[in-house]
């Protein structure tokens, strides 16, 4: 992790069906580094896993008394959410990173639509609080599979009143129709976090909007079909090493295989920890960290998911 801060679990409570909210305080009682809305922390669990969670209470403070995160139960979890839901107790000692923000709100956006799906409400709730504090004209659409799964519902109602619009899939015959609801653009920007189908629908519905007016955070990076993955040569320039990255492995896997210890956290292309400088090669970007402009520059990549489209990739490592 980029930093190592000792924390203690001060409180655990349910904020929706299968969603637990955690309050984390510095183990020594010190203030924690502050963050702006949209920021996340890396949370290191005793089972050896490191997971990223959005800060629900980050609104731009210089320091924070505590970090608040929410964790949804995931039956397909690789061990993070299951461990938290089944084993985490008040008083548990953990370690976290300093906050990072790859989903920051632009100050020039004064009319904002916030769109949350499921556990994606966590950064969106922080943004709603920040908008209220800064006098931004904000509207929030929150959706979930069923009403009991809408997290922070009472807090959002108190904060937004009639500017909060709720959608339960089981009561309304399926997911929200974004194409219909976004037919008229009344906002400077949309900020969205939720499951891939919702964000894919948002992308299609706003394809004609101005660049930079739709910003989203995904739960995991894109997956390249196995039929499109080809082996390629990897050169680590400063280390003086080269190897072949097989079709079934990532650049990060190959680096570790040849003995290079490179920082990583999510291994899903969403946290930005494993960003590496590119000297040569056609990068196939599969992350959700870099902007379209940064991707076009071909100067850096997330080695946990992105690959090389040509025969040779040279990294400044």
From Swiss-Prot:
Instruction: Enumerate the spans annotated as 2Fe-2S ferredoxin-type domain.
Output: 232-317
- Kindly list the GO molecular function terms attached to this UniProt entry: 2 iron, 2 sulfur cluster binding; metal ion binding; monooxygenase activity
Record function comment: Involved in the toluene-4-sulfonate degradation pathway.
InterPro entries assigned to the protein according to its UniProt record, in alphabetical order:
2Fe-2S_ferredoxin-like_sf, 2Fe-2S_ferredoxin-type, 2Fe2S_fd_BS, Beta-grasp_dom_sf, FAD-bd_FR_type, FNR_nucleotide-bd, MRET, OxRdtase_FAD/NAD-bd
Cofactor(s) of this protein: FMN
Matches recorded under SUPFAM superfamilies: 2Fe-2S ferredoxin-like, Ferredoxin reductase-like, C-terminal NADP-linked domain, Riboflavin synthase domain-like
Q: What class of enzyme is it?
A: oxidoreductase
Q: Which UniProt keywords apply?
A: 2Fe-2S, Aromatic hydrocarbons catabolism, Electron transport, Flavoprotein, FMN, Iron, Iron-sulfur, Metal-binding, Monooxygenase, NAD, Oxidoreductase, Plasmid, Transport
Binding positions (NAD(+)): 110-220
Q: What is the organism lineage in this UniProt record?
A: Bacteria, Pseudomonadati, Pseudomonadota, Betaproteobacteria, Burkholderiales
EC number, UniProt record: 1.5.1.-
Protein name per Swiss-Prot or TrEMBL: Putative toluene-4-sulfonate monooxygenase system reductase subunit TsaB2
The protein's assembly and partners: Monomer. Part of the p-toluenesulfonate methyl-monooxygenase complex TsaBM, comprising the reductase TsaB and the oxygenase TsaM.
UniProt-annotated binding residues for [2Fe-2S] cluster: 266, 271, 274
Please tell me the species this chain comes from.
Comamonas testosteroni (Pseudomonas testosteroni)
Q: Which residues form the FAD-binding FR-type domain?
A: 4-106
Gene Ontology biological process terms from the UniProt entry: catabolic process
Q: Name one Pfam family in it.
A: Fer2
